[in-house]
């Protein structure tokens, strides 16, 4: 039902509402709901988020837990957007920064040799095609983290560059970004002719952060 649904890319709306209105009720609501979601869906062994409770007991073909690439990309993109607006003195900022760094560190280790991330973070062999919506969100988050001094540049820049070059290679001559998994809830196979606006949006967000870095 609706009251039990929480979306990882929605919390930045509340930080923006706070900026627009100055009313701290939006920040307080976001903090409460985010921590409830974190407690429910974050796997502290794998340092990754489940898409929702239905995946707690499911396993991939290789026996590993099901962690959706784009789902965790949404979380990282959302965290970057929260941190852009959350007041520096907010008592909960440390929680978001530490979670951001922890998640970036984890996904960095799951990058494929070709620079992409896959639809399934722990079973890429079952979904061998690149998946650009998770890749573009992760690239955006890494670039933001480096720019803001949250991530060590020497460690994360090579991963970022590799990811950026990979996603650029998925852009066709007509400008279409391929390998974007369609709307869904879990890992699925992807082809180059698949595209969606959220993949393109995250691509552009990452590009903006990389432009800042290059100036």
Give the predicted meaning of each segment.
Residues 1, 24-50, 97-115, 158-176:
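Long, well-ordered core segments of solenoidal/helical folds
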Residues 2-7:
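Short, small-residue-biased leader/transition segments that mark boundaries at the very start
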Residues 10-23, 74-92, 136-151, 202-215:
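Well-ordered alpha-helical scaffold segments within catalytic/enzyme domains
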Residues 17-25, 59-66:
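Active-site cleft segment of glycoside hydrolase catalytic domains centered on the general acid/base Glu
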Residues 49-70:
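Acidic/Ser/Thr-rich, low-complexity mid-to-C-terminal regulatory regions of eukaryotic proteins
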Residues 76-122:
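Oxyanion-binding "anion nests"
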Residues 117, 124, 129-215:
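CBM-like carbohydrate-recognition segments
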């Amino acid at each position: 039902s609706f009251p039990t649904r929480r979306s990882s890319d929605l919390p930045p709306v509340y930080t923006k509402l706070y900026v627009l209105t100055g009313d701290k009720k939006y920040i307080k609501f976001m903090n409460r709901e985010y921590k409830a979601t974190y407690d429910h869906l974050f796997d502290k062994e794998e340092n990754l988020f489940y898409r929702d409770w239905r995946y707690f007991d499911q396993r991939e073909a290789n026996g590993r837990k099901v962690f959706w690439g784009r789902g965790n990309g949404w979380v990282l993109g959302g965290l970057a957007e929260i941190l852009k607006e959350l007041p520096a003195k907010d008592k909960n900022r440390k929680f978001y920064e530490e979670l951001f760094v922890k998640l970036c560190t984890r996904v960095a280790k799951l990058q494929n040799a070709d620079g992409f991330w896959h639809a399934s973070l722990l079973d890429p062999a079952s979904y061998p095609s690149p998946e650009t919506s998770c890749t573009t969100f992760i690239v955006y988050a890494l670039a933001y983290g480096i720019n803001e001094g949250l991530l060590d540049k020497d460690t994360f820049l090579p991963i970022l560059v590799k990811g950026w070059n990979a996603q650029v290679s998925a852009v066709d001559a007509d400008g279409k970004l391929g390998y974007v998994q369609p709307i869904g809830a879990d890992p699925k196979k992807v082809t180059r002719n698949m595209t969606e606006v959220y993949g393109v949006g995250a691509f552009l967000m990452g590009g903006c952060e990389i432009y800042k870095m290059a100036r």
